[in-house]
Amino acid sequence: MKIALRVDASSQIGTGHFMRCLTLADALKAGGAQVRFVSRHMPEHLRGMLVAKGHEFIPIKSSPSGTSDDLPHAAWLGTSQHADARDSLEALSDQTWDWLVVDHYALDARWESLLRKTVKKVMVIDDIADRQHDCDVLLDQNLYADMDTRY
């Protein structure tokens, strides 16, 4: 099974997202999966963790396009969702992926639907429920009384 993970991290935000994706990737790899991380922002010490664990890492280069999206956390992406989708597709274009796991507050259904060109299934990890998703599996690790109507 081939699984790609799209997650960013920095010294200010996203390290928790990275760590939960790394934990998932470790378990998937132990089960025989091929795992690739795709990231626009990733500090060297976190990249080092990926390399040490034998995970593939593809950096997405910075893109000149501005953040024109209407999401509350759009600025965290550093570019538009469309530009990021294009760059992510390029990073994954060498093969077909069984799953894409997305853990990013600045990405929504618009981005996810564009990535369906190269992935069979999409899983989104989201714990703030402030945007729509185009996914096969949505994971919110928190317990809420309104979980049935939250998304």
Give names to the regions the model predicted.
Residues 105-114:
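An aromatic- and histidine-rich active-site surface loop
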Residues 89-106:
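Short N-terminal targeting/anchoring amphipathic segment
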Residues 30-86:
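Conserved nucleotide-sugar phosphate-binding/catalytic loop shared by glycosyltransferases and other
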Residues 1-14:
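Nucleotide-activated donor-dependent transferases that construct or modify glycoconjugates
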Residues 120-151:
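Active-site-proximal region of nucleotide-activated glycan assembly enzymes
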Residues 2, 98-99, 137:
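Structural motif
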